[in-house]
Amino acid sequence: MIEDISKKISWLEKNPEIIKNIFRGIERETLRIKKNGKFSNTKHPYLLGSPLTHRWITTDFSENLLEFITPTSSNIDYLIKFLKNLHSFVSYKIKHERMWPFSIPYLYNKSTAIKIAEYGTSHLGKIKNIYRKGLKNRYGDLVNTISGIHYNFSLPKIFWKNWKKSEINLKNEDYISSGYLNLIRNYYRFGWVITYLFGASPAISKYFLKDKKYKFKKNIENILYLPWSTSLRLSDIGYTKTPTIKLNIMFNDLKSYIKSLRKAINTPSKKFSKIGIKDKQGEFLQLNTNILQMESELYTPIRPKRQTNPGESLLEALGKRGIEYIEIRSLDINPFSSIGINKKQILILDLFLIWCALIHAPQMNKENFLVNNKNWNKIIFEGRKPHQKIYINSQYETKTLIEIGQIIFQDLKKIAKILDYQSKNFEYQKACQETILFFKNPELTYSAKFLQLLIKHGIKKTGLNLANKYHKEFINRYNYNSEKNILERETILSHKKQKQIENNEISFKKNNFSHANN
């Protein structure tokens, strides 16, 4: 099942400089809440800048769902510092509110008011707003308030250049894209390991359930949980997933990926056609009635990405210039970190993603896609179950989670040694030594620790205690915030940029109107 990559690791040991400059970026979502734990019902604060044009502070689905975006960097400590400074800046500006520290929101009733995010009067701003209306009408608004962490990761070009020479499975026409797609297929095969280790949504509000039936253990403050679950956010209860298998999206080559995704964006859906495009008052209900309104509606645990030029879609950018980096979307908010993620997680993610790049991934088909999906569901719903087994092939042969986890981590330890040699410290090796213990000791996992807190204190008390603790830390940090002046300038500039975009569109319309009447 798992390839012996000792020769590949030996090759990496001889060429350690080719993985020296890994670039990363972090996006963290968090709900603004009132001091009593209820959703904030105010608009996105003006003091935080324009969510349309601010480089680092924006909104996701709703007005109260903040999203923090770090610059890309090869320095982990810089990323963490920048993310802390973003949180500190925002905490100072919204002193009477707090940031919810969990992926799963505290829902006190089914009719919780949620304001869909707005982005001004420009064409782009309206598109973003209507797209979110579509998400609400297609999947419901509650499910779209679930928060997560997105981890962006890219290996240096020198790695891919050298890897191409030694790896016969890479396609020559675009070896970087081919390499990243190999990584993505392996994440589908083994990414549940990360969910087992760091999943932190073992419980969910009963208001998310609708008609779904699961054998939940108990009900605390309308919160339901499964005794061995890790990340209900990633299940069909929480994080809505478009069925990629039905769309025939298999990540085997970039052309077929783009073709399949374009087909979904342009194919009408019977289900979503019933919603309609506009209501009786002429207000938009969604962008279109197709299977996907746009490419970002494809919810997957990992996806290929590329920076886009103005006016360019992601698919256009990928088609022209190939894959630039990958985005991990299966990370829950770490409730034990004030910024939702810690350094140990980043170190383990680096190692695991390098490992996914080194291991050869067979081409995806419907059969092995279903096997992978079953493994993910095993971990999502019963990951900490004693003697949990994982399917190792399409014949449904199994090994225990402990066996597979330890096999993977033996490779990760060797990669850690190479990375530590580059940085002259033992951070990666230490992270491995600490994390490998999670397999034989499931009580060490984030989901187990978090569930114990929820059972003991309930979600509201636990959430508010941590939210207040983190808020105090961020307020105390503000005077020493090295980014606060930059963030103040960016806030002012973002409002100017939004206004400029809107004014340019007004001028364009006026000019076209006057020309039409000449």
From Swiss-Prot:
Keywords: ATP-binding, Glutathione biosynthesis, Ligase, Nucleotide-binding. The keyword Nucleotide-binding applies. It comes from Buchnera aphidicola subsp. Schizaphis graminum (strain Sg). GO terms for cellular component: cytosol. It comes from the Bacteria. Pathway: Sulfur metabolism; glutathione biosynthesis; glutathione from L-cysteine and L-glutamate: step 1/2. One of its GO terms (biological process) is glutathione biosynthetic process. It holds the Pfam family Glu_cys_ligase. GO terms for molecular function: ATP binding; glutamate-cysteine ligase activity; metal ion binding. It is an enzyme of class 6 (ligase). Its EC number is 6.3.2.2. Belongs to the glutamate--cysteine ligase type 1 family. Type 1 subfamily. The gene is gshA. It catalyses: L-cysteine + L-glutamate + ATP = gamma-L-glutamyl-L-cysteine + ADP + phosphate + H(+). This is Glutamate--cysteine ligase. The lineage of its organism: Bacteria, Pseudomonadati, Pseudomonadota, Gammaproteobacteria, Enterobacterales.
